[in-house]
Amino acid sequence: MRVKLKKVWLIRHTESEANVGGRTSDPAAIPLTAKGRLQAEQLVAAFIEKPSLIVSSRYLRAKQTAQPVRNKFKRVRYEEWDVHEFTFISPDRCHDTTKPEREPLVDAYWQRCDPNYCDGKGAESFSDFMGRVCGALKQLKERDAAFCAVFSHMQFITAVLWRLEDPSRPIDSKAMKDYQLRLDRNPLPNGSITEVLLDSIGN
């Protein structure tokens, strides 16, 4: 039996205020910069083919990136899924901070290398994050959409790609370290599009 492949575009949001060193408090409310809004408009040109489904995370910067594509394809179904960024530091601990000011907290988190550790309110553990990634892959597998455009975030997209390489890998400290190395060595540019093909069993 021939397996029908589904095309998925994993699109990182365009330039945000956090990306250029702006002070932020709520991870969900970080907006795009003026440059990021222009980049979002330019993304539309990549869509030669009409998508079957447009998906975005609930975070503002992803929704703003998706908006020009939604404007072009007004009749295409749009949904918001749990494909938001991995927030592993509690927002309460980094209110009104810049990326450099958060770096000691970030370094401490990865050095701990405990997949079950949760930093506090508004944060999630690495294990829970990977559960969310697997949940999104399951949704993509189950939806009747030949071409799905997913507007998401660098850590989430990297996790999807990493998980697809070895779906049965246990989520332990070794896996967490491997993921971190992948993230550090292969950063995704703002506005980048990564295409994956999923078969009928989600691989």
Where are these regions (language model features)?
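Short, well-ordered beta-to-alpha junction loops that form the rim of enzyme active sites
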Residues: 14, 57-59, 83, 133, ...
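Active-site-proximal alpha-helix that buttresses catalytic centers in soluble enzyme cores
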Residues: 2-78
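Generic beta-sheet signal
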Residues: 8, 52, 144-154
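Active-site catalytic microenvironments for nucleophilic, acid-base chemistry
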Residues: 46, 68, 72, 139, ...
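Short, active-site-adjacent cap segments at secondary-structure transitions
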Residues: 17, 61-63, 86-87, 156-158
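Conserved histidine-centered catalytic loops in small-molecule metabolism enzymes
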Residues: 49-82, 104-112, 162, 189-203
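Phosphate-handling substructures
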Residues: 31, 71-135, 184
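Acidic, low-complexity terminal tails and accessory targeting/binding regions
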Residues: 2-6, 75, 86-100, 162-203
